[in-house]
Design a protein with these regions (language model features):
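Active-site pocket-lining segments that scaffold enzyme catalytic pockets across diverse folds
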Residues: 1-22, 31
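Gly/Ser/Thr-rich loops at beta-strand to alpha-helix junctions
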Residues: 4-10, 74-76, 125-128, 235
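Short Gly/Thr/Asp-enriched flexible loops that form oxyanion-binding sites at enzyme active sites
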Residues: 13, 75-94, 130
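Short helix-loop-beta junction
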Residues: 15-27, 131-137
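N-terminal small/polar loop signature for handling phosphorylated ligands or for N-terminal nucleophile
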Residues: 21-78
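Gly/Ser/Thr-rich active-site loops/lids in small-molecule metabolic enzymes
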Residues: 23-27, 87-106, 191-194
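Well-ordered alpha-helical segments embedded in enzymatic catalytic cores
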Residues: 50-54, 100, 150
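Phosphate-binding and adjacent anionic-ligand microenvironments
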Residues: 60, 64-66, 87-89, 107-278
Length: 278
């Protein structure tokens, strides 16, 4: 089951999947065509439950095993999978990223195609468990600020040092993934294809993505991640944020070079707060 959430992903995603052999694709009709008003999904973000609900309804009617949804500009992809009781569970970007990282690395090792000095790039708000998976396969982790442009920047730096071929995978917790160095930004088409390949591989062994995720937790440690967004709308919201930032800056003893704060509560539990202007 696939939804473009009334965005641009329909043609590139479905064409790519069909050309790669995934032809049994059902599309969510109400969200098929681009529509900037987003009539069925006021907040077309594949990270959130509300955006995926119509797709889940379709998936349940069609008995689909996997639901894919790309955001309007098709650079991010979210998924929901069927659990043991037939209900659909939305995976977080962190969970999907962990699964993809392990799958890509394990397949490279299995087929003798692991790169020299392999590298995984992630944002600092992305789950730390990914570093343990990367280390298991011999990958070096590069942590960067939030924003996939910084992952692209690292690919550029690797390229300048003649090490672009060492890039294996990059992702951020907001459902952005990139499996190669051919572009400098997250790619929903690439992500959708790799998710389908991974899903098919495990399905052939009668292993669900939820089962595989549980297996990873048992090996590398159980993790919990949640995302909370707080909106400050309009000019009043902007003014409130500006006053708050100025007030905090006046009381701060040291300069803050990044638009985020990371709090270590009880190690390894941490929380990150960051601002984002839309």
């Amino acid at each position: 089951m696939y939804s473009s959430l009334n965005g641009t992903g329909l043609k590139p995603v479905t064409r790519t999947l069909k050309e790669m052999g995934y032809t049994n694709i059902t599309v969510v009709k109400e969200q098929e065509q681009p529509d900037g008003n987003f009539p069925t999904c006021p907040y077309p973000n594949p990270e959130i439950q509300e955006a995926m609900e119509l797709g889940m309804e379709y998936a349940k009617k069609c008995h689909a095993d996997l639901l894919l949804a790309t955001d309007p500009d098709c650079d991010r992809v979210g998924i929901a999978v069927k659990n043991n009781i037939g209900e659909y569970e939305l995976l977080t970007g962190n969970q999907t990223g962990l699964l993809l990282l392990d799958y890509i690395c394990s397949q490279r090792v299995k087929h003798g195609k692991m790169l020299d000095d392999p590298v995984m790039v992630k944002t600092i708000v992305t789950m730390d468990m990914s570093e343990r998976i990367a280390a298991h396969y011999g990958l070096r982790t590069i942590n960067i600020l939030t924003g996939f442009k910084f992952i692209g920047e690292q690919i550029g730096k690797l390229e300048q040092s003649s090490k672009a071929a060492s890039y294996v995978f990059g992702f951020e917790e907001s459902c952005g993934y990139l499996t190669g160095s051919y572009v400098r930004d997250k790619d929903g088409v690439d992500g959708a294809y790799m998710i389908c390949e991974m899903f098919s591989y495990y399905a052939a062994q009668r292993i669900s993505l939820l089962d595989k995720l549980e297996e990873l937790y048992k090996i590398y440690g159980y993790c919990l991640n949640t995302l909370h967004s707080y909106e400050f709308n309009g000019s009043a919201g902007f003014t409130k944020c500006r006053i708050s930032c100025r007030h905090s800056a006046e009381k701060s003893k040291n300069s803050v070079e990044r638009r985020l704060l990371k709090y270590w509560i009880i190690r390894p539990v941490w929380m990150v707060c960051r601002s984002q202007m839309c």
